[in-house]
């Protein structure tokens, strides 16, 4: 079977005299049953998204970090294609489903946030010495925060493999499982042109797009693996979550610069970062990130007991190995945590 959606609005594309963009999009999908418990699927979809009110107009401070408006932000558009195969299986007391899929997504004017320094008087990012002088002569002061902007072009593609099912030991004893692996290649399609442009920068306060010259988008990881196991025996449940992720590929330039410095000498922005983020016992944000931005694995365990049909208790330990890790600068994950939960159903 197949399904195709295509929408067209036959109306005046103006609201209160303001022109509203008209963007038809095509979406198509195909599902085919090849055999018992064997399915092939394919899909293609175009997308068009106008900036939200938050991205375009909001000015707010959250815990000392500001969100700054950008009225020049443009709508993002793109398309996504996916091809997948799902297969059911049964081996004795074991039964489940295996799913394999490949995906490709392309964006134009992709909307992403960028951290930086801002003039609180005019909500403008400080991007040069003249911007800094304008901020100092004004009365608004400065703030650190994020502003949404457009990335010219981005391509994200990869594959996902997952399986889930159950092993029945007997009527009262079961093992449920869910395993998944995702490989993602998050490409900045214009990174060469951007790097060439940034090499011409002469103003020491001019902001670059990200912390390195790589071809990757910010705040992405290539590899993710997750496993969930739940062993049930009558009213008792013993479960475990295991997750493994690869390192973050790039972050914002305001936080650190991973590029090689000429003659190893610090630049003006290095001193700005020292003033903004400080250090503890000689450990700066950059040195901490270099040490902890690595592949990492976490383990959570839980023990649950269903006392009655209406009342259940669960004891959980998150980050069992007390792993210190960080998926982005200034965001250290919680240490080992113990929790007790009671569920009551009325």
Predicted segments with their positions:
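Extracellular loop and loop/strand-boundary signature of outer-membrane beta-barrel proteins
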Residues: 8-17, 66-71, 145-150, 210-215, ...
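Transmembrane beta-strands of outer-membrane beta-barrel pores
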Residues: 2-8, 44-50, 57-59, 87-89, ...
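Residue-level signature of outer-membrane beta-barrel architecture
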Residues: 22, 32-33, 46, 75, ...
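Residues that define the transmembrane beta-barrel architecture of outer-membrane proteins
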Residues: 20-24, 77-81, 155-159, 221-225, ...
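Gram-negative outer-membrane beta-barrel transporters
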Residues: 93, 101-106, 125-254
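Surface-exposed extracellular loop regions of Gram-negative outer-membrane beta-barrel proteins
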Residues: 1-14, 21-27, 163-165, 172-181, ...
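Membrane-embedded beta-barrel scaffold of Gram-negative outer-membrane proteins
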Residues: 33, 39-43, 74-145, 155-157
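C-terminal beta-signal and adjacent terminal beta-strands/loops
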Residues: 48-49, 106-109, 115, 243-286, ...
């Amino acid at each position: 079977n197949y399904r195709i959606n295509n929408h067209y609005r036959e109306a005046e594309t103006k609201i209160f005299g303001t022109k509203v963009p008209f963007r038809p999009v095509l979406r198509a999908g195909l599902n085919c049953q090849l055999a018992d418990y064997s399915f092939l699927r394919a899909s293609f979809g175009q997308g068009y998204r106008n900036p939200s009110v938050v991205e375009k107009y909001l000015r707010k401070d959250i815990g000392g970090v500001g969100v700054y408006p950008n009225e020049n932000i443009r709508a993002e558009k793109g398309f996504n294609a996916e091809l997948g195969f799902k297969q059911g299986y049964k081996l004795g007391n074991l039964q489940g489903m295996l799913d394999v899929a490949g995906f490709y997504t392309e964006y134009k004017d992709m909307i992403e946030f960028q951290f930086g320094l801002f003039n609180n008087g005019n909500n403008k990012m400080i991007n040069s010495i003249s911007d800094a002088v304008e901020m100092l002569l004004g009365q608004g002061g400065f703030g650190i925060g994020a502003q949404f902007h457009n990335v010219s072009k981005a391509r994200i593609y990869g594959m996902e493999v997952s399986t889930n099912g159950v092993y029945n030991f007997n009527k009262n004893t079961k093992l449920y499982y869910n395993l998944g692996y995702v490989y993602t290649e998050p490409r900045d399609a214009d990174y060469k042109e951007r790097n060439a442009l940034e090499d011409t920068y002469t103003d020491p306060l001019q902001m670059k797009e990200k912390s390195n010259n790589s071809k990757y988008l910010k705040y992405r990881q290539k590899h993710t693996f997750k496993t969930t196991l739940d062993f049930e025996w009558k009213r008792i449940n013993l479960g475990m979550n295991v997750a493994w992720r690869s390192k973050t590929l790039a972050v914002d330039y305001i936080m650190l610069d991973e590029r090689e410095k000429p003659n190893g000498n610090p630049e003006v922005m290095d001193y700005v970062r020292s003033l903004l983020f400080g250090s503890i016992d000689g450990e700066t944000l950059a040195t901490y990130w270099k040490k902890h931005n690595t592949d990492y694995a976490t383990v959570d365990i839980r023990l649950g007991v269903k006392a009655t049909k209406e009342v259940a208790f669960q004891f959980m330990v998150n980050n069992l190995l007390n792993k210190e890790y960080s998926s982005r600068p200034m965001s250290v994950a919680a240490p080992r945590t113990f929790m007790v939960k009671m569920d009551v159903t009325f």
